[in-house]
């Protein structure tokens, strides 16, 4: 669907999106942190520290940080609980073998297009600190004709850390150490940001920012539990355990989706979601219709531009795990359009990020203490 056309007006209680948004320090710190699935300690610490100023903070054994924003003083007791989550892990690489020449062989953590990896500089997270390497393969000059036609596979690639031999490499790197591509955030013109790990440090930032906006407004009728869930790219582990432990009365998941204003993307398949068109509200079989309507109506009331994305089956996000937790959780999904997903050069319009946080905060503030999502 086409985005709604907003009038020039600040949203009540939930802040105002800057005309030409800049990247906040906490988002840049999140993007600079190394945190593939299962190894999210560094970005989780950034997120947790940022939440301490306005929420009660903790971390579970899976590695998911939680920020609880208390309901306003005159809210019904006990208050209902809204869970807002965005996963904080990223795709990465994991060392599976170190050969006697000192080359590191690796597997993928999450879904990679192997062609993207060739020639990339990487940073390995080891017990001794950061180790720099490069993903290598046989040079094109030495490839046979049949090899030149073959698409690169991860099993054909290795990481070179400049080791003299296997012993030298093993002194610095262990089996099971992880790596990410060395591609930190770069602010581009027109309020755009380029980085690896926008999928989904953006979602974790939005959950954090929405919680901050609700706290700044004095709380909502519902308690708000914001989480930056671990392990989405591999198992949905963080969302499964968080939804089970927190027993929310409703949930809103924040992730990224494909921006369709890049070459080669068919809007007939996934809809029209351009950079700058605002958050993308999902509607589909696994998502609760009343939460969709709440988000849709809130966006219209707050004059926030948005688009709608249809999801016929599963969404490929944490929403798939949350909505079937325990006896079921009414779940909504809001996404941020980005270009070049699962690459080191993901690209976003920062205004969309701020607008997404504003939308979720405004929806949380609209929830009545007696609201139910029965069908």
Stretches found by the model and what they are:
Residues 1-375:
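N-terminal hydrophobic/helix-forming segments and targeting peptides
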């Amino acid at each position: 669907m086409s985005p709604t056309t907003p009038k020039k007006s600040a949203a009540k209680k939930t802040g105002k999106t800057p005309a030409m948004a800049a990247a906040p320090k906490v988002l840049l710190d999140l993007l600079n942190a190394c945190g593939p699935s299962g190894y999210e300690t560094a970005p989780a610490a950034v997120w947790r520290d940022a939440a301490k100023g306005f929420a009660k903070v903790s971390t579970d054994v899976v590695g998911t940080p939680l920020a609880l924003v208390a309901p306003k003083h005159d809210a019904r007791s006990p208050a209902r609980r809204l869970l807002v989550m965005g996963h904080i892990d990223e795709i990465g690489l994991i060392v599976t073998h170190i050969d006697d020449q000192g080359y590191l062989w690796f597997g993928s953590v999450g879904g990679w297009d192997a062609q993207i990896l060739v020639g990339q500089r990487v940073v390995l997270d080891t017990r001794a600190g950061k180790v720099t390497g490069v993903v290598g393969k046989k040079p094109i000059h030495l490839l046979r004709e049949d090899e030149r036609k073959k698409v690169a596979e991860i099993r054909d690639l290795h990481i070179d850390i400049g080791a003299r031999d296997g012993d030298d490499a093993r002194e610095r790197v262990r089996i099971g150490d992880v790596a990410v591509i060395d591609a930190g955030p770069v602010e581009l013109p027109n309020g755009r940001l380029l980085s690896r790990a926008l999928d989904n440090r953006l979602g974790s930032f939005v959950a954090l920012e929405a919680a901050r906006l609700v706290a700044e407004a004095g709380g909502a009728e519902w308690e708000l539990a914001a989480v930056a869930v671990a392990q989405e790219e591999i198992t949905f582990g963080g969302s499964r355990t968080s939804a089970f432990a927190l027993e929310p009365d409703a949930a809103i998941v924040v992730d990224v989706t494909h921006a369709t204003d890049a070459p080669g993307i068919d809007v007939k398949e996934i809809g029209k979601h351009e950079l700058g068109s605002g958050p993308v509200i999902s509607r589909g079989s696994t998502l609760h219709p009343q939460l969709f309507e709440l988000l849709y109506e809130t966006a219209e009331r707050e004059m926030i531009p948005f688009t709608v994305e249809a999801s016929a089956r599963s969404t490929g996000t944490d929403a798939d795990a949350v909505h079937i937790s325990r006896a079921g959780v009414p779940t909504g999904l809001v996404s941020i359009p980005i270009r070049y997903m699962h690459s080191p050069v993901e690209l976003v319009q920062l205004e969309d990020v701020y607008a997404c946080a504003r939308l979720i905060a405004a929806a949380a503030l609209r929830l009545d203490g007696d609201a139910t999502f029965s069908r």
